[in-house]
């Protein structure tokens, strides 16, 4: 179910504060966050945000096509290694 339009998109307050501070200084640095549920808003464009995937922080450069998506969509948590090969010896 999508979020109601009368509600604003969720962005963690600490993340929003860091981005606003960097925008006023016109600086670029990597912002580390654990907030995967935060929505990408236009003020984040051009920043690099390191999103936690459960094990490490993955740096993601934010572009205009990402606006409206959640940060967690760009940091996969599971690495699929493929199905087990057909080994007849292990079945016996």
UniProtKB/Swiss-Prot annotation:
Gene Ontology CC: chloroplast; mitochondrial small ribosomal subunit
The question of whether Secreted is a record keyword is answered with no
* Keyword annotations from UniProtKB, A to Z: Chloroplast, Plastid, Ribonucleoprotein, Ribosomal protein, RNA-binding, rRNA-binding
What PROSITE patterns does the annotation carry? RIBOSOMAL_S19
- Which compartments does it reside in? Plastid, Chloroplast
The answer, when asked if Transmembrane is one of the entry's keywords, is no
Tell me the GO BP annotations in alphabetical order: ribosomal small subunit assembly; translation
Q: Which domain of life is it from?
A: Eukaryota
Task: Provide any one GO MF term from the record.
Answer: structural constituent of ribosome
| SUPFAM superfamilies in alphabetical order | Ribosomal protein S19
Q: One Pfam family for this entry, by name?
A: Ribosomal_S19
The record ties this protein, via HAMAP family, to: Ribosomal_uS19
Give the similarity note: Belongs to the universal ribosomal protein uS19 family.
Free-text function comment from the UniProt entry: Protein S19 forms a complex with S13 that binds strongly to the 16S ribosomal RNA.
Query: This chain belongs to which protein, by name?
Result: Small ribosomal subunit protein uS19c
* Source species: Aethionema grandiflorum (Persian stone-cress)
Quote the gene name from the UniProt entry: rps19
